[in-house]
Design a protein with these regions (language model features):
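Conserved beta-strand/short-helix segments
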Residues: 1-218
């Protein structure tokens, strides 16, 4: 089967937990996608819990995946999810409760068709902060892209600060994203930026200043 297993992958800090994205799997409809989690146990990789399937046909869940340090929290990007329009995208977070993977809070959806939210995702070490890339978003021009950062308050995911928009149209900002361990510094890849020639690309780094995201360096 053309499942495309390994399109994304993440490890816990100790390397004993593994998450594998399988975006073309058909468990909940054609190309709904899924993520499987494995634990290293007695010399073999054993699946922990059931497959976490995409919500619907064509979601491509597992295009991106991130794990908390202890491997007990997993974030799953489904950039082709269509709740807010075709390819608006979606991000879901699950936590291991000892017997199964249970969703934490509501799904986070892209704003509109083409946003492709969930193309990239990153988690802080404790799994309480997530950064989500939506490179097709048009907030600062067509396909300028953006990243949104959310924090878990015990009941739901609350956005921290404003959307971090790409600099200009076609930046595709949010194609890749990374978070520091404490979730207070985020690095954002924008491969379509033309600052040093067509599609030369760039990376911007932001730090949470208590009220807003402040760029570090140029």
């Amino acid at each position: 089967e053309a499942d495309a297993a390994g399109t994304s992958v993440a490890l816990s800090s100790d390397g004993q937990m593994l998450a594998i994205g399988v975006p073309d799997a058909d468990g909940n409809g054609e190309n709904s996608g899924l993520v499987r989690l494995y634990e290293w146990d007695a010399g073999t990789w054993s699946q922990l819990g059931g497959d976490i399937n995409g919500e619907a046909f064509g979601d491509a869940a597992g295009t991106s995946v991130a794990l908390s340090s202890d491997g007990q929290t997993v974030a799953i990007g489904a950039p082709q999810h269509a709740d807010s329009g075709r390819d608006s995208g979606q991000l879901r977070v699950y936590q291991w409760n000892g017997s199964s993977w249970v969703q934490m809070g509501a799904s986070i959806d892209g704003y509109e068709g083409g946003d492709a939210l969930g193309t990239s995702v990153a988690l802080s070490s404790d799994g309480q902060t997530i950064a989500i890339g939506a490179p097709g978003n048009d907030g600062n021009g067509l396909s300028s892209g953006h990243v949104r950062v959310y924090q878990w308050n015990g009941n739901s995911w609350l956005q921290i600060g404003e959307d971090i928009n790409g600099k200009v149209k076609a930046d595709l900002s949010g194609t890749s994203v990374s978070l520091s361990s404490n979730g207070e510094i985020v690095a954002i890849g924008a491969p379509g930026n033309d600052g040093n020639g067509s599609d030369s690309g760039h990376v911007t780094i932001y730090q949470w200043g208590g009220h807003s995201w402040l760029q570090l360096g140029g």
